[in-house]
Every structure is written in structure tokens, then in C-alpha cells.
Amino acid sequence: MKKIAIFAKVHDPRALAVAEELIEWLAARGVTAHVEEHLSKRLRRTTLAESSESTEIAADADLVVVLGGDGTLIAAARLVGERDIPILAVNLGSLGFLTEITLDELYPSVERCLAGDFEVTERMMLMASVERSGEVVELHRVLNDVVINKGALARIIDMETSVNCRYLTTFKADGLIVSTPTGSTGYSLSANGPILHPELECISITPICPHTLTNRPVVVAADSHIAIKLNYAPDESVFLTLDGQVGMKLLSGDVVQITKAAHVTRLIRSRSKDYFEVLRTKLKWGER
């Protein structure tokens, strides 16, 4: 590996300090670090790193290192896009279901990556589009979830949902979460959605505060085509949020289409813990 892209939480002094140390450590080993321009402006020593626009940082990188929390990783995963580059995610945040590498593991983990000695877990992603009057007006790839949510003063939304062109139900709820297994421990979990092992190939559909109490989360096959048609009064506000980071206002009659993405996010595994240990630790299972 000769080129490593670094994404860091730019408003976190700790992440900036670690990024500076890592850039120097890599330079001493003949490895070029590549950082985003807005990150480069916040680093004190930038001569050892190359910088470019966020969308180009991973263009020809051999590895991506993420320094921050799950939000930083999710943003990086979208920018990596179709390149299938392995991502080493280091947890400098709080919860960190996805960033399972600890700071103490950073340099040993990078050493192994440079030597080609690492394992990856592949996380499925979703493609979400918004169709308006027969035309696609938005198209995005997501790692965690696609969320339809009503505004503060809006009434319950009618969301006519079909799977593979077969009618499922019309959810009458505050919103709907369509999640990957990776995203099942995010917003979906707060809405009583199922916890899905991240290596499963499936999609969960979870209503938010449904009017009908028997509306429960539904899990469908990963290759399913999910279509959600919205119906609500024109003076109400309904929003689409992708991975909690990209959003847009929806209109009544819009159809949100969701399918499995062609590419995956490749996360480097921690050598010191497995997924169930992460669950126990983060959710504090077994504690009183």
C-alpha cells in the first residue's frame, strides 16, 4: 500500500491530533497520506499530506482510515462509493457500533494493513431514489438507512408500501425506516426494529409510532424492490433523510424506491473483538 486516504472528524481536536500523528507515521514509512481540503486547513503540519476535494480523496487510495465516530464513517463510505476500498474505522466517538477499532489498535492495525494481513467484512448498501411525476429527482447510496419522517406539525403520514410490486400495507405512522443490517442498530433500533447481524443479506422496514399497533417491523430479502408512495395534505411537511446526513423535502405523491446497491462497504475487522462483544458492550447487556 502506497497511498492512504484519511477522513477525520474535523471539529474534534482529538481526531485532528491523531490525524497529524498518523500522517507523520505514514510518511516515515514511505506512504503518502491523502486528506480532504477542509481537513488539511485544520492541520498544523500539512506538508506531508496531499489534499483534494472530498469526492476525489479516495480516487486511487489503497486504504481509507476513518478517525471519528459512526457518522464520520458513514460519510466516508458514501464518498468511497463504487471503489470497494477497505476502510479501517477507528472509534474516537461515543457509541461506535461501526468504528470498532480502538485508538490503541490504530498503529498495529495499520501495520497489518500495509503488510496485506487483514480481514474485511462486507456490509450491504442501499440505493434510494425519489420519483416525482414519473421522473427520478434524487438518487443516493446509503449504508445505514432511508428514513421518511413527518415535520413537527404534520399529521400522520399514509405510506403505501409494496415489495416486488406486491402490496404490503399502507403504514399510517409518523414515518418509516428502511434499514440495512448495518443500520439495524441505529434509528431503527430506537423504533423497536430488529437487530440484524451485519453480514446478513436482508432489509428491514420499521414504522415510526404507527397508528395501528399491530404494524410491526418486516424483514424482506436483500434483492427486494421496495416502493413507498406518500399521501398527505399539501400543507404538511414530510422529509426524506439518508444515513442521517443527507435530506430533502418530499411532496405528496412522491414515490421512494429502495433497492440493494451493487457495491458494498468493506470494513476491516478488529482482531480483538467480535460483533457480539460489540453488541454486549455498546448496549450494556448483562449490566445492572
UniProtKB/Swiss-Prot annotation:
Catalyses which reaction(s): NAD(+) + ATP = ADP + NADP(+) + H(+)
Superkingdom per UniProt: Bacteria
Q: Name one GO molecular function term.
A: ATP binding
Do you know which InterPro entries this protein is assigned to? ATP-NAD_kinase_N, ATP-NAD_kinase_PpnK-typ_C, NAD/diacylglycerol_kinase_sf, NADK
* The keyword Glycoprotein appears for this protein: no
Question: Which cofactors are named for this entry?
Answer: a divalent metal cation
Q: Where is the active site?
A: D70 (proton acceptor)
GO BP annotations, alphabetical order? NAD metabolic process; NADP biosynthetic process
In this chain, NAD(+) is annotated as bound at: D70, G71, N144, D145, R155, K172, D174, T185, G186, Y187, S188, L189, S190, Q245
- Give the record's GO CC terms: cytoplasm
UniProtKB keywords: ATP-binding, Cytoplasm, Kinase, NAD, NADP, Nucleotide-binding, Transferase
UniProt cross-references to Pfam families, sorted A to Z: NAD_kinase, NAD_kinase_C
User: EC number(s) in its UniProt entry?
Assistant: 2.7.1.23
Spell out the family assignment given in the record's similarity comment. Answer: Belongs to the NAD kinase family.
- Name-wise, this protein is NAD kinase
Which organism does this record belong to? Geobacter sp. (strain M21)
Protein's gene: nadK
